[in-house]
Amino acid sequence: MGSNLPAQPNLRLTTDGLYKRDVFRFPDPFAVATVGGEQTHTTSVIKKTLNPYWNEMFDLRVNEDSILAIQIFDQKKFKKKDQGFLGVINVRIGDVIDLQMGGDEMLTRDLKKSNDNLVVHGKLIINLSTNLSTPNTNQANGLHRSHVQSSTSSGLVPQVAPSSSHPAASGTAPVDPSASNPSLNPQRVPSTTRPSSTAAPASAAGAAVSNSHGSRTNLSSFEDSQGRLPAGWERREDNLGRTYYVDHNTRTTTWTRPSSNYNEHAQRSQREANMQLERRAHQSRMLPEDRTGANSPNLPESSQQAHTPPAGGSANAVSMMATGATTAGTGELPPGWEQRTTPEGRPYFVDHNTRTTTWVDPRRQQYIRMYGQNANGTNTTIQQQPVSQLGPLPSGWEMRLTNTARVYFVDHNTKTTTWDDPRLPSSLDQGVPQYKRDFRRKLIYFRSQPALRIMSGQCHVKVRRNNIFEDSYAEIMRQSASDLKKRLMIKFDGEDGLDYGGLSREFFFLLSHEMFNPFYCLFEYSAHDNYTLQINPHSGVNPEHLNYFKFIGRVVGLAIFHRRFLDSFFIGAFYKMMLRKKVSLQDMEGVDEDLHRNLTWTLDNDIEGVLELTFSVDDEKFGERRTIDLKPGGRDIPVTNENKAEYVELVTEWKIVKRVEEQFNAFMSGFNELIPADLVNVFDERELELLIGGIADIDVDDWKKHTDYRGYQESDEVIQNFWKIVRSWDAEQKSRLLQFTTGTSRIPVNGFKDLQGSDGPRRFTIEKSGDPAALPKSHTCFNRLDLPPYKSYETLEHKMSIAVEETLGFGQE
């Protein structure tokens, strides 16, 4: 065949990683192939995809100098000004195939921009053949599959790419602009890039690109680019494109790839060590009314020895708190008192003055701290007072001693106990932070309600440690709600322990690790980090998933009812949903960070002529993509500047609530069998997190050690004051601060060094930012606190307290 005579090669096309120009929907791509402006062929339209594979053949009449131009368009926007342009390539036929010798060539080319400089992305794969034999469609399919994990981008507005029309594939992800500045510049295209963990370097030569991806074509889920995974391990990706590994031997998941010299014994030992750390942390969690005076603010020794009250009429508000500390009784009993002994030989004391009895020796003086804020803002003890001088207890109250001789009080009217002496002014007065007054009082009220009282009898639950999920499901689901309200008695198969609280704590610890494990596809990790959880919208892969969600709801209710804690933490929106509160755009940050940025941009900018949106969203479930109307006929209703707020609200509700509504309703049906909805609604979402998970003992030294500073030095006065304030706070206030800055009160098992952000490990950071007249601001996705340069310790403490105590909800960005 002469080079000057036209030849008739065949053409097949596929593309991968097209640019998603619309924020909320996928394009309907088709290709137009043109030779010399005369021969034009158009492919069919592939609906809603960034990786179309047409597998259509066209006959072309070309010579060596012919230019083949292939353009990709979005059929949805073909009538718009830019015709939905998605990229173009131009190929000189003589450069890629020898028309005289014939042959079959597979080419991979990067899509290029047009003269309009619209951002494009992705690759076009072409099969050119000069014979009539059928091309190797398997090869084309393999190449198509090999690009599935290529970098993808999403954007809001057509922009000029800063350097090239596509990002280079590399081993590390490009830096997200929001990572350093959460206040996203509206002129910048919000994007996220999730390359595979070991992507091959991009090559200018199409053949090189083709080969590099072809080498990964046959990788199964049991291997990756580093080789075969150990026996029983599988590689998976979550909904955010993050790779994690499943160990089917132990039914656990991890973000860390198992090493090639995998040692099962060493791995098991490490898991057991981590489990012990988590167990100790879990068992140390508590709530305000469970903690002793040791967790109260410490007073100077000199002030504790003060015995003389101040002059009357002091302007300082004085509050009182019983420490429960006692001293040994010596000498004679006070007038009117008598000591007697029960038949069991236990001494008790009769006060004939008030005709009351008590276990407490009136000679054993109970110290009453009376402290208030003086002129310089420090706490000062006013006096100590013996219990015997306080008079009788109110009707229905009883004083008792713990086995460590610490006094506590029983209110038989409400069947509750407290450390606070009812004869003293409430320790929860104006000197205590508002949130603490509210939470503790809510807790006392909540637990005093008849629906939360343990019924007579026992509820026996027998489980095997190595099969705790299935055994617990069978045991808890076979019993009625009223049976579950009886005293809980846990027994582990093959163990002789009696449950006086320790076994039930161990039970809830182990069970929460199992039932929230992403291995079972019921829950998945959030966009915030890899330890807060959200409901998996694809949990329907298990046909019994709704029964399991009802079971999990029962377990959460059971833990609250029996005053136990679960070692699990959810996104803020989940707690809001439990309280039947309306979710907001801020809650989206923990579910889908990119969508949160895009919706925020939509609200803050003019979208007329920029975004072609309707009141509908595209959703993919088990490979099937469908359009969902956000309101009746939504796919035909355009989004404008006037109705975009409603659109954002509906998208937020669909993404957070509607997608998992079926699962969540099953969860709540089980939960409300033990905890009535009207009772749990007394809490807010942050208090509900503490009610379910308890309050952790936070190691401030570890926190400080793994903190970064921007604009500050560790030696700066404001930083020194910050850590002094944190150390002076009790465990509950520290947990509140942790919630405020990271979105959860959970601490990773290995401490703050393993703190996670939305894009992987992210250390706690204090940044110099803001006006000293303003409050500190947190960025929960990045574990960052914007701290203005306050001039004094008092100002910093005041501003921090207001920010932490009065701010509601997660995602303060």
Swiss-Prot record:
Q: For this protein, what reaction is catalysed?
A: S-ubiquitinyl-[E2 ubiquitin-conjugating enzyme]-L-cysteine + [acceptor protein]-L-lysine = [E2 ubiquitin-conjugating enzyme]-L-cysteine + N(6)-ubiquitinyl-[acceptor protein]-L-lysine
Output this protein's name: Probable E3 ubiquitin-protein ligase hulA
Q: Which organism is it from?
A: Aspergillus fumigatus (strain ATCC MYA-4609 / CBS 101355 / FGSC A1100 / Af293)
Occurrences of domain HECT (ranges): 480-813
Q: What is its EC number?
A: 2.3.2.26
Q: Which GO terms describe its biological process?
A: protein transport to vacuole involved in ubiquitin-dependent protein catabolic process via the multivesicular body sorting pathway; protein ubiquitination; ubiquitin-dependent protein catabolic process
Q: Which family does it belong to?
A: Belongs to the RSP5/NEDD4 family.
Q: State the pathway, as annotated in the record.
A: Protein modification; protein ubiquitination
> What ranges does the record list as Polar residues composition bias?
148-167, 251-264, 293-307
Relate the protein's function as given in its record.
E3 ubiquitin-protein ligase which accepts ubiquitin from an E2 ubiquitin-conjugating enzyme in the form of a thioester and then directly transfers the ubiquitin to targeted substrates. Probably involved in the regulatory network controlling carbon source utilization.
